[in-house]
Amino acid sequence: MKVTKVQTLRADRFMYVKVSTDAGITGIGELHPGSGTGGTPFLPIAGVEYCAEYLTGKDPLQIERHWQHMFRRCLFRGGADVMAAIGAIDQALWDIKGKEAGKPVYELLGGPTREKVRLYTHLGGKTTDDLAAEAKAMVKEGFTALRLYPFGDFGGGHSFEEGMGLETMSFTSMQRNAVERVAAVRQAVGPDVDLMIDTVNRLTPAEAIAVGRALEPYNLYFFEDPIEPENMDAWGDVAANVPMPVAMGERLYTIYQFQDLINHKGAKYVRPDLSLAGGITNIKKIAAIAEANYIGVAPHNPLSAVLTAACVHLCAAVHNIAVQEYPHDDDSGVKRDLVNAPMKREGGYLIVPKTPGLGIELNEDAFRKYPPKPYTRPPLINPDGSLREY
């Protein structure tokens, strides 16, 4: 069996890689926008084309060999965009391997360690009342873990990823706002639901430590991405000075970066993204590094149902999975239209599938309804005109 074609498919803000073979077996994976969060994601698409030059004509079942070639043939390494391409292609190759073997991917990774995968979902409410109401609804639906962005009443149709409001807050109001929002959710759901916050790498270490300490009474499961991702000494400092576990890793993409994070004691949970950090092959290795240090894995999953499917197979096969991020709209709207059927969910868990490969297929006929559009975030401009992290 040989690879005959590697192509990128786009619909709405989502991108996929499809790998075709001369045996008629195809595999799919989800492509992260990488550096494309500021506009058209042409760099990860170019990364796919770069990897396709190597992969076309090769046996798709030799996944580790191909992973190493795609990673190392770029002499100065490819950064996030090439790693995103490798990650999507890797998912597709595992999909092919599972289909060829007639087995679900997790069976090829050592077999299942669990029958279902615990989820956390994000609360998108803009006011404290909205957050409390949504939290109650999610708990009623069966979720036992919830995450929120702890700043701002947004207004203007902005999402938590855009973070509008934080840039206008003083050091003191930042803490007060976080306490008000987290307290509203904790009061709504009671003491036994796990709560997390995500500040999307937007705080300074001083701000992160102050916010973390202010939230100590609310017993957070973890504090996700408090500061910018590059300086591991700073991560170790923050982790040592906040009263809850720190989770980090969605903007890292190599085993070496995660090893550095762990060596600096910068996180108790790592959050690699299968569509950014080299796919199933690489994240299985990241999880092993974490396991050797008694660190949990909480895979990042901000995209659509194909990435969710890949995450489920990884979570099934990896012992030290703590919890899996889950976009609540995975099984509705545009995301539902783009696939034949999403992973089966029962309350706050996804059921490990029995079907060969990843167990999900694209509904390419639906792509015509959803023309590609760029994924953008507005810059956060502080009152003095300076830039805060996007």
Range-by-range predicted roles:
Residues 1-28, 32-36, 329-337, 390:
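Structured beta-strand/loop patches that form or line metal/cofactor-binding pockets in enzymes
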Residues 20, 37, 46-53, 65, ...:
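Shared catalytic-loop signature of beta/alpha-barrel
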Residues 1-10, 16, 98-99, 103-116, ...:
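N-terminal amphipathic alpha-helix/helix-capping segment at the start of soluble metabolic enzymes
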Residues 358-390:
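Extended hydrophobic packing segments that form well-structured cores
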Residues 20-100:
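Metal- or metallocofactor-binding catalytic centers and their adjacent structured scaffolds
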